[in-house]
Amino acid sequence: MDSQRTLLVLLLALVSFLLFQQWQVAKNPAPQAVEQAQTSSTLPAPSFADELDPAPAQQASAKLITVTTDVLTLSIDTVGGDVVAADLNQYSAELNSANAFELLRDTQGHQFIAQSGLVGPQGIDLSSNNRPSYQVSADSFTLADDQNELRIPMTYQANGLEYTKTFILKRGSYAIDVEFDVINKSGNNATLGMYAHLRQNLMDAGGSITMPTYRGGAYSTEDTRYKKYSFEDMQDRNLSLTLTNGQGWAAMIQHYFAAAWIPRNEPGANLYTRVIGNMGDIGVRMPNKTIADGDSAHFTATLWAGPKLQDQMAEVAPNLDLVVDYGWLWFIAKPLHWLLSVIQSFVGNWGVAIICLTFIVRGAMYPLTKAQYTSMAKMRMLQPKLQAMRERIGDDRQRMSQEMMELYKKEKVNPLGGCLPLILQMPIFIALYWALMESVELRHSPFILWIHDLSAQDPYFILPLLMGGSMFLIQKMSPTTVTDPMQQKIMTFMPVMFTFFFLWFPSGLVLYWLVSNIVTLIQQSLIYKALEKKGLHTK
């Protein structure tokens, strides 16, 4: 029995070590630009790669306009109308920094931009070095206090066609509608279609073999709710998928934040990736429309550029909220995040919410915990009989196993009963780890006193040391029948090893584990008192 518990504790330690590796990668990412030979590819109709000059886009021109809302500050290049910078006004770059987090940017060393345009026979974005120079009414646009919507129209004329590209931003929203209106006065039919993609330097996504982090592409279609498509995948093979019903999106995601293009009412759109030099594109090419002389056409797509806020993203597009990737334990992590958010809405502090969540989870598991300690106590009571049985039977393992099972059945003892709560707690622990790791709400969220960021490690290691001390107390209070010296050393070393791993874990996760241990000490005391009355435990 105690050997099984030792094995489970070792397994939990291994899980903690793997999570520790993952946290180190997430905390200290080291992306490296990946050089790639220039690539040209052909995609099924509509063939985007054949329509747009594959030369890498030049750095943003000096003709930029600034668009500011309560949550976003955008820089839009009037040449092509690309979004070349996006600052998230309500998210600081670093803790206590006055600078906003830059999601999109176009600098000498790094490019991550959102491009959109019109291609096809009468398209105006067929060459990356000869894109339209739009006219705008001002150099800056700001959402006024009495406004809920801000519209920025940009106009261009060529060959008898009038083009208007409009950016529409709304208060409190990270979703940006991008619309094209084309009026044909050329005297002939005009055929063109819209494209929208994200372009970023190819990077090493980082991570470990066991539990990798992720920075790269992702997409959704009618048949695939959510799938990652890494920079390495892009280099191996260009993606080309048809959105039969027009439902889907293409995204570039990273820790806490994402950018995505969502086509609107465009059945038959083509979702694609391309590699150009050391740049990777992922986006959507909408079907062509033929505009008769004197007629007009309308094209639209939505750009999400912001934090991974699940509720808002789910409203913008189906499955867009799945970029908050909880891994294979999502069915546990998602309800935990929901419950944590509900609690926080009442208590107003994410640290207090974690404490409350811990009490709820451990309270729900109390019947199992009680059964565990009762089973362990009964097993200890059977030790004299088991020892006598070993002396009587000797080395006959088959007979020993048979008589042990008969004894367990007679005494109504489940030898695995003490392991069940530990087995159940491991997936909850892992799911909560991912819930805390993926929750942008915890980023730079303070708790009390010295804890200013629950998503970062404790700067003074106070919580990990308290957690290690609580594990030591639990160990001292727990009776054991372990006689093997090696197992005794392993169990004694466990608090030290866990403390070491947890030194660099997010303080929110360490807080959960510390409070969970405190609850264990309380429950343990109550259960032992009840067992003493039944004669199953002695101090």
UniProtKB/Swiss-Prot annotation:
**Which terms does the record give in the GO molecular function aspect?**
membrane insertase activity
InterPro entries in alphabetical order? Membr_insert_YidC (IPR019998), Membr_insert_YidC_N (IPR028053), YidC/ALB3/OXA1/COX18 (IPR001708), YidC/Oxa/ALB_C (IPR028055), YidC_ALB_C (IPR047196), YidC_periplasmic_sf (IPR038221)
Chief location of this protein within or outside the cell: membrane
A Pfam family reported for this protein in Swiss-Prot or TrEMBL:
60KD_IMP
Topological relation to the membrane, as annotated: Multi-pass membrane protein
**HAMAP family to which the protein is assigned, alphabetical:** YidC_type1
NCBIfam families reported for this sequence: PRK01318.1-1, PRK01318.1-3, yidC_nterm, yidC_oxa1_cterm
For this UniProt entry, which segments traverse the membrane?
Answer: 6-26, 341-361, 416-436, 454-474, 495-515
Function of the protein: Required for the insertion and/or proper folding and/or complex formation of integral membrane proteins into the membrane. Involved in integration of membrane proteins that insert both dependently and independently of the Sec translocase complex, as well as at least some lipoproteins. Aids folding of multispanning membrane proteins.
| Name recorded for this polypeptide | Membrane protein insertase YidC
Q: Which GO terms describe its biological process?
A: protein insertion into membrane; protein transport
Q: Which organism is it from?
A: Vibrio vulnificus (strain CMCP6)
Q: Name one GO cellular component term.
A: plasma membrane
Q: Which UniProt keywords apply?
A: Cell inner membrane, Cell membrane, Chaperone, Membrane, Protein transport, Transmembrane, Transmembrane helix, Transport
Q: Which subcellular locations apply to this protein?
A: Cell inner membrane
Question: How is the subunit organization of this protein annotated in UniProt?
Answer: Interacts with the Sec translocase complex via SecD. Specifically interacts with transmembrane segments of nascent integral membrane proteins during membrane integration.
